[in-house]
């Protein structure tokens, strides 16, 4: 007998594309963190800079300035500009607190000129020697309105002739003559101012300024330079 060859056919199924795995989201937790809001940063009103600014602004609001550094061009710009602002027709008093080792005689002259302009406009110019008024600072102090020159009890004041410091050694004889003449003009001007501001004679002022002459508040009052000895407070 012939054997029957039976072949079995299997139906081929088309391969289906595999499903993409689903992304598993993390489980949500009930206690969500609240968004943290940045804290507002406020300026520290008690910092050194803030307090200094507050004090400076207070004094300026009372028409008061401090000459408490070397009397140089920077001080000139500050003091003269501020004093000029107060030549405003109000005739309100102006207060100058002083604690300075001195400095430029030209700057002192500019400040004194502005003080006299304030007086001419009807304002009294109070000068208050807090600790030390030396050299050019002593001239500014003395130029205050008579009767309005205060000194703290322990304050000192020092007068001497004007001088040039740190002059270049490489100078001609003509240059030295120019410096000498400038000093003579400045010293004559300051001597006249002190005679008018005090009870001293011209000879007494010249003798005082011929050297470094230091005075206590009481001694300066006897000379007619200080009017009142007390700690001064703004009205």
Region roles according to the model:
Residues 1-235:
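Terminal-region recognition feature
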